[in-house]
Design a protein with these regions (language model features):
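Topology signature of small-to-medium multi-pass alpha-helical membrane proteins
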Residues: 1-123
Length: 123
């Protein structure tokens, strides 16, 4: 359970930071309102899953899988917008999306194998 919460916290912080960059709060030069909105929504979904894992611990795994999957889908939509030319196309944005995909896939793998991993830790 703590691993799931830790991972959701990490992902929510990453999307929140990206939203702040795209809003021009942390760094100037990468402003993009639609990207900031999308990253904010994804970050809030991840925070909701984190909150749900505290309130209803038995649903942690399901909430994490659902929220990480939604975040991955949103990130893939972001990559699609970059490819077709309507999303931000800086090197920062490309690296950001590649990093998001890698971390989300790692998180999904970690959560999906969570019970096996937890059983090995207890043995």
């Amino acid at each position: 359970m703590p691993v799931i919460r830790w991972w959701l916290s990490l992902e929510a912080a990453a999307f929140g930071g990206a939203a702040l960059v795209h809003a021009g709060v942390l760094v100037h030069g990468y402003e993009h309102a639609k990207a900031a909105t999308a990253e904010s929504v994804i970050g809030l979904v991840l925070l909701f899953a984190l909150f749900a894992s505290v309130v209803a611990p038995r649903s942690s795994r399901a909430m994490a899988l659902a929220s990480l999957s939604l975040a991955l889908l949103g990130t893939l939509v972001g990559i699609f917008t970059i490819v077709i030319g309507i999303g931000p196309r800086s090197a920062f944005d490309i690296a950001l999306h590649v990093g998001f995909v890698a971390s989300l896939l790692a998180g999904l793998g970690l959560v999906a194998r969570g019970r096996v991993w937890e059983q090995r830790q207890r043995a």
